[in-house]
């Protein structure tokens, strides 16, 4: 192989290695984003469950009050 071909090959290899490093960094960023979104999702699920429990409790209270009003009328 000529020196020129070796130089071109070296340049291509270097560019490929740089691309691989950039992709590794992007992958790590995406993993971090996924982790953050997963945590937020879990928090929202817990909050939703709490709100559903509160809604059920309020519905029971309102139903009880309506029952009391109906029995007094």
From Swiss-Prot:
GO terms for biological process: division septum assembly; FtsZ-dependent cytokinesis. It is found in: Cytoplasm. Keywords: Cell cycle, Cell division, Coiled coil, Cytoplasm, Septation. Its main location: cytoplasm. Residues 3-66 form a coiled coil. GO terms for cellular component: cytoplasm. It comes from the Bacteria. InterPro entries: Cell_div_ZapB. The keyword Glycosyltransferase does not apply. Belongs to the ZapB family. Non-essential, abundant cell division factor that is required for proper Z-ring formation. It is recruited early to the divisome by direct interaction with FtsZ, stimulating Z-ring assembly and thereby promoting cell division earlier in the cell cycle. Its recruitment to the Z-ring requires functional FtsA or ZipA. Homodimer. The ends of the coiled-coil dimer bind to each other, forming polymers. Interacts with FtsZ. This is Cell division protein ZapB. It comes from Shewanella oneidensis (strain ATCC 700550 / JCM 31522 / CIP 106686 / LMG 19005 / NCIMB 14063 / MR-1).
């Amino acid at each position: 192989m000529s020196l020129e071909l070796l130089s071109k090959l070296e340049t291509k290899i270097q560019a490929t290695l740089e691309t691989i490093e950039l992709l590794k960094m992007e992958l790590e960023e995406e993993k971090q984003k996924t982790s953050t979104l997963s945590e937020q999702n879990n928090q929202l699920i817990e909050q939703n469950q709490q709100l559903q429990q509160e809604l059920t409790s309020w519905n029971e209270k309102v139903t009880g009050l309506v029952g009391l009003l109906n029995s007094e009328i």
